[in-house]
Amino acid sequence: MITYSLLHMIDTLHTEEDCRVYLENMRWNGKPICPHCGSISEHHYKLTKDGKFEGLYKCKDCRCRFTVRQGTMFEGSNLPLKKWFYAIYLFLSHKRGISSCQLARDINVTQKTAWFMLHRIRYNVKDDDANFNDMTQVDETYIGGKTKRNKGGQGRSTKQKTPVMGLLSDGLVYAKVIKNARSKVLLGVIDELVRKDSTVISDSWSGYNKVKNEYIHEVVEHSLGIYVNKDGFHTNSIEDFWSQLKRGIIGIYYLV
């Protein structure tokens, strides 16, 4: 897999023209596609301004004008593509997240603009059609609110926290806010996303007891101090995701 450093990105995508050409190559591969009628052609008209082409096309079939930004997160934004590309890079490279205040400082925009950019980026990287096959780790956690100790100092209350369920397979994570962590709710999420002949790996929480009725169920007995079961299965990856998520929240938000 090819990876790029920020310095490589700065050198390669140095100007707005560089960024536009890069985006056109990634989206169209040399054949611009009209977003209005779907016409694919190397011969759409290139419209110039003061003798210079700046990425505005006119469809040879429906005669509508378009740019490579249309149909992307960049549509309707007057920000240079270079700032968008840098924002995407910073968003993806900060595994614990990046705040709108920090992004604003990094790319020299207002906090309001950075907030808008981050929301567009998050919306475009989400995957609502995730499907999990083969081996899937599942776990639930509680996020947000203030942690309060119960009377007598025993345990911690989760009444002010929001339950979230997570599924992980082959590096893909799906997290969903759930009503509660009872069996009916947990199984509903699993049934929605996981293929029936798959292996589901969980801890020994009773909410997963019925998983074995529909899936190959591997249990890791955390309550016994076991974190890898006798067959080598674990839930370490999804738990690491929770850890990164919570650290990101602590580092960016005052309260969730």
Which sequence ranges carry the predicted segments?
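Residue-level recognition of single "structural anchor" positions
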Residues: 1-256
